[in-house]
Amino acid sequence: LLDAKSWHDRAMTPQDLHALVDYNYWATHRLLAAVDALTPEQFVRDLASSFRSVRDTLTHVHDAEWIWLSRLHGVSPTSRLPLDRFEDCAALRAGWAETQGGLRTYVDGLDDAGVQRVVEYRLLNGSSSADRAWHLVQHVVNHGTYHRGQVTTMLRQLGAAPPLPLDLVAYYRERRG
């Protein structure tokens, strides 16, 4: 195992980050396909989760991706977007498409130096922080994975069919053919 400093200094490649971002949206699209089957009432039903409903949880993930993408571009948002801004899954998907395209474009434009670049930003509470670009992109993907698991549980609570497998290895297998 690498010690903490060695691990922190070891960079992913631009290709590694591209694969992770591609996986992130592959899994998100699979999840949204399952969410499409929900009724409008199910989409917003309070399930007493971290974020009350399927809509609120997915909106939170989209919002977080938008915030991190903004920070990667040197802009630090000072507030979150409202969780109730999407009426249905179609509106959520449309709103997410721009952020998805932005993150893909950002990662596609990275070279080795860009991957290692230290990004300085402010948290929503106003405190400052700085992290390498590849750490932030990894965080976006990991955050999405965490909440996709929550939404999968919510779908089961609602009696809806869970999504197709969302595992990273399933993504690699599918890409391999």
Predicted regions and their residues:
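Leucine-biased recognition of intrinsically disordered, low-complexity hydrophobic segments
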Residues: L1-L2
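Helix-adjacent hinge/juxtasegments
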Residues: V75-Q116
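Short, contiguous alpha-helical
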Residues: H18-P82, L123-G177
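A short coil-to-beta-strand element that immediately follows conserved catalytic motifs
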Residues: D112-V118, A161-P165
